[in-house]
């Protein structure tokens, strides 16, 4: 083989080798680029999902907050309504008790309150406290009470109490006290009324 042919063959081999290397490089770069593209695309998809999920969570939280505020507002309104009803009922009861003081049966009612109070007292010397209205009635019934109650010395406080009605009985030391007033009466029924209103209003 002459020199020119030999050179031509070598040249061809070099070109073919270069082309092969070029194809290999291109193929590797292509694979690398495709992998990078797929990775980028996956990251983009993940980011998009994160953003969508974040918006969903925020939307859910806002919805829950709105619902919670609405429920709280409704409960507050119902609670206010119940308090209004309770206040109105107690006021009406107080007015009726006040009117009852002028009823013919109030004399016996007051006498019974005093007797009930004395029956739970352990002291043999008690002080009876009343308002000015009931004090006048008590002066009319105290002799009857003294005859009906044994072994108890009854003393009547001269200074009238600032109460709606009823009686407060205490021993001389003020350690034992029994309150049978309109106020304590209303306080006792207040809880029962509130429970009943709660079941109907809330």
From Swiss-Prot:
One of its GO terms (molecular function) is proton-transporting ATPase activity, rotational mechanism. Transmembrane segments: none annotated. It holds the Pfam family vATP-synt_E. One of its GO terms (biological process) is proton motive force-driven plasma membrane ATP synthesis. Belongs to the V-ATPase E subunit family. This is V-type proton ATPase subunit E. It comes from Halothermothrix orenii (strain H 168 / OCM 544 / DSM 9562). Gene3D superfamilies: ATP synthase, E subunit, C-terminal (3.30.2320.30).
